[in-house]
Amino acid sequence: MERIVECVPNISEGRRKDVIEAVVNEVRSTPNVMLLDYSSDESHNRSVITFMGEPEAVVDAAVKLAKKAAELIDLTKHTGEHPRMGAVDVIPLIPIRGITKEETVELSKKLGERVCIEADIPVFLYEDSASAPNRTNLAAIRKGQFEGMAEKVQQDEWAPDFGGRRIHPTAGVVAVGCRMPLVAFNINLSTSDVSVASKIAKIIRRSSGGLDCVKALGIMLEDRNIAQVSINMTDFSRTPLYRVLEFVRFEAARYGVQVIGTEIIGLTPMRALVDCAEYYLQIENFNADKQVLENYIQ
């Protein structure tokens, strides 16, 4: 069986098109890898790149990408709404076909070691690859961001898994690990008051007692002068998109605010969108496996 791994690096650059293209070209030029998608956000000052391929080829592409990002992105000059700790901030690997989660964890460790050696960036292993429970959650690792990371890594519980107690002077550190597919889902609000988005994010995220498998923060989109609830959904089968959207809509109404649009960043499983169609259309006795045309022509 063909072995396929997906990789979704996030880089801390969403404004300089030449830099973004230079980083993406490292993926394009790697044999046995397919570039699927990349998108950028100027307010976040961040880009999400998605590619997949044979496991070793994906590792090669990710290492090349990390090296180029470290060469071209200087976090001492970086500003943006999204939290960040590295020029390449996070490199997740997702098992797609013919490879187990356990094998992908081992692959992520090889990737982390190579990124450390070849790009000179200290590496934290996170999610299913985490070396300790406190490193499972990316937000916990990233707390303090680039500006506080040099001090943070001196603590015993926050020493990087690869690279020693230091950070790259301009590229920071990076999180590398195996995770399951997630949905990056942003909800835009009819207000320029970011505190409203932050309050809603706190209510809906799991860490504050909200919805299961939901991570969220409130940010300001300066270019549009609106606030946004930025969400990562780590298991849409347990908490579907429509439930998150309706929860946010309900909470926003308390502040006299409306949902004015949503965004999906990068690729998302078809099932997540079909679930929404089934819910909002109130389709009775729906069977996506048998009633969605594309399922017969894969």
Q: Model-found features: residue ranges?
A:
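Long, contiguous binding/interaction regions
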Residues: 1-298
